[in-house]
Amino acid sequence: MSGWRRLLEEESEHQWLSFTVFSIIVIIGAVLIDWSSDLSGVHDGSTLDVDGIVMDSAGDSILYQSDDGIRITHDDNENTAQYATCLEEYSGMTLACLGNEGMLGFIGDGSDDCDDTWCQFSIGENLTATQVSGNGLAILMVVQDGTSDALAAIWFGESNPEPMVSDHEGNLHLDVMLPTEDGWLVGGSWQAPANWLGSNPTSPPMYELVIHVTWDGVNAPAIEIVHMGNEGSIHGLFTTDDGYIATGTSDTISIIDGEISSLGISSYAAIGDNNGDVWLFGGIGSNTVAIISGAEISIERLPEPLKILPSYVTCDEDGMIAIHGTDNTDNPSAMSIDSNARQSFTSLRGILDLSFILVSILIFSIMGWNIYEAIRKGEVF
C-alpha cells in the first residue's frame, strides 16, 4: 500500500502519470472503437435451410429455385411447384400463388385435409395470380393480363367467386403489396410504351411505381398513383410509426400523411426488422447497409464487402435477418445479420465503449483525488 501511495504522491506533484495514461487510452480506444464500428452479428449462412435460391417464405413454408426447378417446402413436406411465384401468411394459414389458372393454394388451415397438405380454392375463371394479399375478408391479387399485370379482388370464402379486375392504362409490373387501413399499397414499375419520349422501342424503360388500391366489394379495385419515380422498380413496402417506406432500385421514399419524401437511397433488397427499422442492401461489393429508424438514417459498415446479389430478404421472430441471392459465380448464397446485435450492450462496440468510459472515470478519479490532496495539504499544483 505504501508503494501505491508513493506513486500517487509522485503523480500529484508532476501530473505526468494520469496525462500519459489517459493519452494512451484515448489513442488505443479510438483505434479499437473504429475497428469495432463494423456491423455486429454478421455471419455466413441462413436460418432458411434449403439447397437453392430462396424466392419467398411465409410461416413454415419456403419457395425456392433449385437445380431441379422451383420447389416449395412446408415443415418436412416438399413439393415441385414449377410455376409458383409467391407465399403469404393470411388468417393463420399460408397462401401460395402456384401458377394454376383460377386457383390459389393454401396450407395450415387446421383441417384434417389441408393442415399438412397443399389444397386449392377458386379465385375465378381465366385468372392466374402472381401475388396475393389479404385485408380482412378481402383478397387482392396481382394477376397476369397479357404482358402486363392487373389487380383482381375477391371475398375470401366465396364458393363461386366472380373477381373484379382493375382497368388501368399502361403496362404495369407489380411485385409487392402491403395492407393499409383502407386498402393496399402496391409497388413495382410502370413500363413506358414503345417510342415513348424517344426511348428504345424494343426495350422501353420502366419507372418506379407506388399505387394505392381500394375496393368497395362491388366494383373493380380503384387505383390511385401515389408515386412514379426514376427508372427502376419498387421492391419493398414497409409500415413505420409515422407512415410507410417504399424501397426501390433507384430511390427510397417515405409516405407520411400523403406527403412523399425522397430519401435518396437505392437498394436491391430490403426488409423490416422487429424493432420497426428498415434495412436496405446494395449489390455485390457493397461495403455498407443503410438502416432507416424513424426519421433517422444510419449507414453501418459491413465487416467485409457484400458477396451476394440480394434477391430476397426475410427477418424471423428472433430478429435474425437472412439475405438470399447469388454470388459472383451465379451460385446460391446466403448470409445472416442479427438485427438486435447492432445496439446490444454485449456487442464488441458496446463493450469497448463501456470499457473506455470506465477507464476514463478511473483516471479522472485519480486526478481528482490528487487535486483534493494537494489542496488539503496547501500544496501548489
Report the location of each language-model feature.
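Residue-level hotspots at or immediately adjacent to binding/recognition sites across diverse folds
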Residues: 2-23, 29-381
